[in-house]
């Protein structure tokens, strides 16, 4: 994917006209795939050019009738980059601008949840409530998709598509993720939900676990040695994109964002502040209600932070998706400690996971995707 700085460096300073900057911004914003508004273009240019950004983008678009075309009369008017505009941009920049479907993202964030309630319900509420979302997608597909927009702190409008897998577990999560990626081509896929935490490190209900890596702890070989059946683990761990990891590390202690989120919760909450943990999280198709089983897993992963049932399927599906590959991240909040399970903290954990994930994207999107 070509970023805005590439367009800037492709021509001499005197050739960076308003027309060139606006057409370049439209290409980076994927206006050749889905239309954008003058406001979106203006905010993008102000973010990258500051006071040197074009003053009246709306008037400029109306003047570039050979290069751009209104696709929706609005309000606001939606604009697309035409074939003529692409050719003009190619001739000005000297860049080969491929516009095939396989070379373009079509949405920003894809969200996968294992459960409609409480996990997806918390996500819908974190993005303005159910009325802020609209259903979309082909009814021939098994999954129901909802679309909404969130406004990042930078002023960028992000297209968000959410879905739930048809059941809990790695296979269902991998299928849901694959279908979402192929249909909506998001830049980033986020698994949001609840998990069981390990007792080490003073974790408490509502703490956020970000899997880095996610480990399929049931992957391996069962052998019989000296009459004793033994499991020999042989997992293929999948970690975070380095940039995503670096940005998340800023939230690795009692960050003030957790106090802000806690203030929006009206119900029982832990006494100590919540925080984020970044490290290994195990995944497998089994519900664990036995603390000794967690200890067995920790023999192989001493820094294990928790266990759950979906993230590895999401990470693996993204890892093996077509180019351009999205990035993947998982936000799972602690709802129990894999023993004496109870539903009493699930709503709070789902709330914390959803609210933190959306707040993180709002605050850090330009850090995750500097060109957007």
Regions found by a protein language model. Give the residues of each.
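Short alpha-helical segments that sit at the start of domains
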Residues: 1-25, 32
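Short acidic, hydrophobic short linear motifs in intrinsically disordered regions
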Residues: 32-45
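Helix-turn-helix/winged-helix DNA-binding modules
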Residues: 33, 49, 76-77
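Short amphipathic alpha-helical interaction segments
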Residues: 49-63
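A short, conserved structural fragment
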Residues: 62-75
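Accessory beta->alpha helical hairpin/"wing" motif in late/C-terminal subdomains of nucleic-acid enzymes
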Residues: 72-93
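Intrinsic-disorder/coil detector with helix-boundary
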Residues: 94-371
């Amino acid at each position: 994917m070509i970023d805005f700085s590439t367009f800037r460096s492709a021509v001499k300073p005197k050739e960076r006209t308003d027309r060139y900057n606006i057409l370049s911004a439209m290409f980076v914003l994927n206006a050749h795939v889905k239309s954008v508004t003058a406001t979106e273009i203006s905010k993008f240019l102000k973010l990258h050019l500051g006071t040197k950004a074009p003053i009246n983008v709306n008037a400029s678009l109306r003047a570039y009738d050979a290069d751009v075309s209104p696709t929706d009369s609005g309000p606001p008017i939606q604009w697309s980059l035409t074939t003529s505009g692409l050719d003009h941009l190619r001739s000005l920049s000297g860049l080969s601008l491929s516009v095939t479907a396989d070379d373009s993202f079509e949405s920003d964030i894809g969200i996968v949840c294992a459960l409609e309630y409480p996990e997806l319900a918390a996500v819908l509420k974190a993005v303005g409530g159910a009325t802020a979302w609209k259903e979309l997608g082909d009814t021939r597909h098994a999954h129901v998709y909802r679309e909404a927009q969130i406004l990042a702190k930078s002023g960028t409008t992000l297209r968000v598509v959410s879905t739930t897998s048809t059941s809990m577990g790695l296979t269902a999560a991998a299928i849901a993720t694959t279908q979402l990626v192929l249909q909506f081509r998001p830049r980033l896929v986020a698994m949001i939900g609840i998990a069981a935490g390990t007792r080490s490190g003073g974790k408490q209900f509502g703490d956020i676990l970000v899997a880095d890596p996610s480990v399929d702890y049931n992957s391996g070989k069962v052998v019989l040695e000296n009459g004793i059946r033994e499991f020999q683990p042989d997992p293929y761990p999948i970690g975070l994109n380095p940039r995503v990891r670096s940005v998340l590390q800023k939230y690795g202690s009692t960050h003030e964002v957790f106090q802000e989120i806690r203030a929006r919760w009206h119900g029982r909450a832990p006494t100590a502040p919540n925080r984020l943990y970044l490290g290994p999280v195990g995944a497998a198709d089994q519900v664990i209600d036995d603390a000794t089983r967690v200890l067995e897993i920790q023999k192989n992963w001493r820094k294990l932070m928790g266990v759950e049932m979906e993230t590895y399927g999401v990470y693996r599906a993204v890892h093996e998706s077509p180019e351009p590959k999205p990035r993947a991240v998982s936000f799972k909040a602690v709802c129990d400690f894999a023993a004496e399970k109870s539903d009493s903290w699930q709503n709070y954990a789902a709330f914390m996971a959803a609210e933190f994930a959306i707040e993180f994207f709002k605050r850090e999107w330009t850090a995750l995707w500097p060109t957007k």
